[in-house]
């Protein structure tokens, strides 16, 4: 049985309104200079004695450590968590071909990150021998279950595609953990447009030395009357797995012989998409996707002119739907 979960959204991030996020400038933290500390003057003889003593000390005293503001949940001296830490809400998972963050409440990945090169895409592993499976690394009460997808009407959509993990059977099999899976509309999306986008990302390795891709679900609001509402289906019996309204792919590509980074951010609705729809129609500023997802992408890269350029300015952002010769099996 499917149920609908509704929330009143306080932030406008859905549909066309996601563009409104681009006008929201980030507030930089204000630095306040501390007042100078005045110390009484020392007599000259006392200063000379102190300098001589300091020169004789081979080791300096350790600096004063700042007060710890973020407490470890296992800290026995933390009175608020004396009898246990209720978190985390997410599990971090590191696999052969990807890293992932899994949301226990929504039973979906928060994000899945990959690094693609021409070399690591090579291999002969075949998905025909792989099976979807529940992830034992997630505590049992919070796992996505195989039965949740049974007759749900949705495909089990990969965030890290199986075709990106042909290195060996183990790598291929790891992409079938449900922690790498989200419910996706099958016809016209997972088996078509989304699959073509996955091929586009792989093909970038033909013109870039390194390609990094982060994929994940979004839950965006739509306007109803004068309110913005987040609505998404929940599948399973009892209801267990959230059905995202959208999916994002954030791509960073780099050439060894060129300075800087090319970055593209895309957000696609979880519904049938006409193949004639240009990929660029789903292109968004990186900051807009970050605000919608509550995530930071490639934050170690300085975002300024000359360092970061648009991916679609470096390469043609078009999909070749004919490149997906072999259709994904139904439900996958």
Task: Report residues per predicted region.
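Domain-level detector for secreted/extracellular nuclease and nuclease-toxin modules, and
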Residues: 1-332
């Amino acid at each position: 049985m499917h149920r609908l979960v509704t929330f009143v959204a306080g932030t406008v991030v859905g549909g066309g309104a996601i563009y409104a996020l681009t006008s929201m400038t980030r507030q930089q933290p204000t630095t306040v200079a501390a007042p100078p500390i005045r110390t009484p003057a020392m007599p000259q003889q006392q200063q000379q004695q102190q300098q001589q003593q300091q020169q004789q000390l081979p080791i300096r005293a350790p600096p004063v450590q700042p007060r710890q503001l973020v407490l470890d949940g296992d800290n026995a001296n933390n009175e608020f968590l004396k009898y246990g830490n209720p978190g985390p809400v997410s599990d971090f998972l590191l696999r052969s071909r990807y890293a992932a963050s899994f949301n226990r409440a929504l039973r979906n990945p928060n994000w899945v990150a990959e690094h693609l090169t021409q070399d690591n895409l090579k291999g002969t592993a075949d998905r025909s021998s792989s099976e979807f499976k529940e992830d034992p690394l997630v505590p049992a009460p919070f796992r996505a279950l195989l039965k949740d997808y049974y007759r749900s009407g949705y495909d089990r959509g990969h965030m890290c595609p199986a075709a990106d993990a042909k290195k060996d059977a183990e790598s291929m099999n790891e992409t079938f953990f449900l922690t790498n899976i989200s419910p996706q509309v099958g016809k016209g999306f997972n088996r078509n447009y989304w699959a073509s986008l996955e091929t586009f990302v792989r093909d970038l390795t033909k013109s870039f030395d390194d390609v990094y891709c982060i994929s994940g679900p979004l839950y965006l609001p739509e306007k109803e009357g004068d309110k913005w509402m987040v609505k998404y289906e929940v599948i399973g019996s009892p209801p267990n797995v959230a059905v995202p309204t959208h999916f994002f792919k954030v791509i960073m590509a780099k050439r060894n012989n060129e300075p800087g980074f090319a970055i593209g951010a895309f957000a696609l609705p979880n519904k049938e998409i006409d193949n004639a729809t240009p990929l660029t129609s789903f292109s968004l500023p990186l900051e807009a996707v970050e605000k919608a997802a509550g995530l930071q992408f490639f934050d170690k890269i300085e975002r300024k002119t000359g360092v970061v350029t648009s991916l679609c300015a470096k390469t043609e952002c078009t999909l070749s739907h004919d490149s997906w010769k072999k259709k994904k099996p139904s439900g996958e």
